[in-house]
């Protein structure tokens, strides 16, 4: 319709109230980054399931690697590597910074439970100034620089590497896993806790965004951070190594690129364009079987052929066969 192939990528869920859903065009195909986003697109926008491909957030395992020392960040902010360091990365916006606020809130209790702990909180946004003021007040009460608010950064791999434990959600959590850090997965949409083998399936279902999980609470966060730092060095190493292997197995950049290329291939312009006319879209088993057979034969013969079906029910034909279809009596569309 627009004269060019159009593929979108869905990374989040959006407000669909009023006329908003009708103002959105998801293109000929959509790449979703998780199964729950795919279900959301089907439910809220009525997209055909066969037009949605699920991929992953691909992580650069060389950039986010145990080989990155974090030394530059440690020197910049005067962190003490002989004391525990917790790193956190997120946008400091009202709808994203709940866990950052909770970390600042529980800092005095963390200091009692884990003497000398340092919180390295990175990110900028519309509540950054407010949170920085709270952090400064907490530091004054503790009589030391317990909380470091870095503001917006581009060297996130260095921020992650500087910490012994990472707290965060979504892509930031995956990047920390790639760096072989133990990770507490927590964000505005929910709380997952210290990631390990027992939590993989649930975490993957929501793309590590915690959608549908219990809300993050300061007391739960305090307990899990304390428990994580009470683990032996070997136990934390094992958790970090497991997280990095999960990235290699399920979240590689190569996998993400392959998924996108496959979807782009589905919509690229073909050299030959074929229009099929018949008794299609009437839910007639015999004619539908013929259509399926012809379509399969064309596909096997050449990937340079684009097929458009003249159908009594174009939506039904698209859903059943993934083929482009137009109303059979609107000849000007041909």
Residue ranges and their predicted role:
Residues 4-35, 46, 160:
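A conserved, positively charged/aromatic
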Residues 19, 42-43, 59-76, 94-98:
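Acidic anion/phosphate-binding donor-loop and adjacent secondary structure
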Residues 36, 58:
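Carbohydrate-associated surface elements
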Residues 73, 79-100, 104-108, 120, ...:
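Conserved donor-binding/catalytic core segment of Leloir-type glycosyltransferases
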Residues 131-153:
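Nucleotide-activated donor-binding/catalytic signature segment of Leloir-type glycosyltransferases, i.e.
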Residues 158-174, 180-184, 189:
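Acidic donor-binding loop of glycosyltransferase active sites
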Residues 227, 234-250:
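A short, well-ordered alpha-helix in the C-terminal region of glycosyltransferases
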């Amino acid at each position: 319709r627009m004269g060019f192939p159009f593929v979108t990528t869905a990374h989040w869920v959006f407000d669909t109230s009023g006329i908003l859903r009708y103002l959105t065009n998801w293109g000929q195909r959509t790449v979703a980054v998780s199964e729950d986003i795919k279900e959301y697109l089907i439910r809220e926008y009525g997209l055909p399931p066969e037009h949605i491909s699920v991929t992953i957030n691909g992580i650069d395992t060389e950039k986010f690697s145990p080989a990155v020392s974090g030394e530059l960040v440690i020197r910049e902010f005067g962190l003490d590597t002989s004391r525990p360091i917790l790193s956190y990365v997120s946008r400091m916006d009202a709808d994203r910074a709940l866990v950052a606020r909770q970390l600042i809130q529980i800092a005095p209790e963390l200091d009692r439970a884990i003497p000398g702990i340092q919180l390295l909180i990175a990110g900028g946004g519309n509540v950054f100034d407010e949170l920085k003021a709270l952090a400064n007040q907490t530091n004054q009460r503790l009589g030391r620089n317990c909380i470091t608010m870095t503001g917006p950064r581009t060297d996130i791999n260095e921020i992650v590497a500087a910490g012994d434990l990472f707290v965060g959600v979504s892509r930031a959590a995956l990047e920390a896993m790639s760096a072989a850090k133990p990770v507490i997965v927590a964000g505005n949409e929910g709380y997952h806790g210290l990631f390990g083998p027992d939590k993989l399936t649930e975490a993957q279902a929501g793309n590590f965004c915690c959608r549908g999980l219990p809300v993050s609470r300061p007391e739960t966060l305090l307990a899990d951070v304390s428990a994580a730092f009470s683990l032996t060095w070997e136990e934390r190493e094992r958790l970090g190594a497991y997280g990095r292997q999960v990235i290699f197995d399920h979240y590689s950049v190569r996998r993400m690129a392959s998924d996108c290329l496959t979807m782009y291939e589905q919509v690229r312009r073909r050299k030959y364009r074929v229009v099929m006319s018949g008794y299609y879209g009437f839910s007639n088993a015999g004619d539908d079987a013929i259509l399926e057979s012809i379509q399969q034969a064309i596909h096997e013969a050449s990937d340079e052929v684009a097929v458009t079906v003249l159908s009594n029910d174009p939506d039904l034909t698209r859903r059943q066969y993934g083929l482009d279809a137009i109303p059979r009596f609107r000849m000007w569309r041909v």
